């Protein structure tokens, strides 16, 4: 009853592996993400990305490799009851891939009862799993703050409204949320990933900062 189905949610792939018996009738989903990110792969390896400036980084190459390894093991041993659905999900970074696959019948079409997924984590000993109740890793949330001021010469900041300085104060203050507004026993992290101005000159105060 093994099968591979492509094109779920446009580019998602699902493989079904059957166990030795099917007394339970259960279908367990094992999921990995396979996004590509705008990063140049300079490993020089034979299997590196063939598309300039794009690679399956951020652990996604590891996730897909682990799931392929799990699928291979399940196919070779089949020492389980029911079926396993190995799910390769696209567009995890943008948050749209899971919804697209579900909307395309992922759960109903394959009758999946439960989903399991893992994320690699540096510092955890090889061959072990770290689990806990509730969230275990940080999420990537998108927010944008646009500051509009008055540009000017860096030597005359009193004649300008220095949006770069204001933005720097905001970035520093964001960390006060963690240290002053959250229970110190809770795991919290806030990191701003980008900081852009509309000026590339060293001696110019920018008009706008994003």
Locate the predicted segments by residue.
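Transmembrane beta-barrel strands of outer-membrane/channel proteins
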Residues: 32-34
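Generic structural signal for well-ordered secondary structure
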Residues: 6-8, 48, 67, 94
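DPxDG-like acidic metal-binding loop motif
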Residues: 64-71
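Residues that mark the start of a beta-strand
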Residues: 25-29, 83
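A non-catalytic alpha/beta surface segment that caps or lines the substrate-entry region
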Residues: 1-23
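A short, glycine/Asx- and small/polar-enriched loop/turn
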Residues: 19-25, 204-208
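Generic alpha-helical scaffold signal
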Residues: 9, 61-64
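Histidine/acidic-residue-rich, glycine-tolerant segments that coordinate divalent metal ions
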Residues: 13-14, 37-39, 43-55, 62, ...
């Amino acid at each position: 009853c093994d099968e591979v189905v492509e094109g779920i949610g446009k580019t998602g792939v699902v493989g079904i592996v059957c166990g030795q018996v099917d007394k339970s009738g259960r279908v367990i989903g094992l999921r990995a993400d396979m996004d590509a990110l705008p990063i140049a792969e300079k490993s020089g390896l034979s299997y590196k990305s063939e598309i300039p400036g794009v690679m399956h980084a951020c652990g996604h190459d590891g996730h897909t490799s682990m799931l392929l390894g799990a699928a291979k093991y399940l196919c070779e041993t089949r020492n389980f009851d029911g079926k396993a659905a190995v799910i390769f999900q696209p567009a995890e970074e943008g948050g749209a891939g899971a919804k697209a696959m579900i909307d395309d019948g992922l759960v109903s079409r394959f009758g999946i009862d439960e989903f399991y997924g893992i994320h690699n984590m540096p510092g955890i000993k090889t061959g072990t799993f770290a689990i806990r109740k509730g969230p275990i890793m940080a999420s990537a949330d998108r927010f944008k703050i646009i500051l509009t001021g008055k540009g000017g010469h860096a030597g005359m900041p009193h004649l300008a409204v220095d949006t770069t300085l204001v933005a720097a104060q905001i970035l520093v203050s964001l960390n006060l949320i963690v240290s002053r507004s959250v229970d110190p026993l809770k795991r919290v992290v806030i990191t701003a990933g980008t900081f852009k101005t509309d000026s590339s000159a060293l001696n110019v105060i920018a008009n706008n900062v994003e």
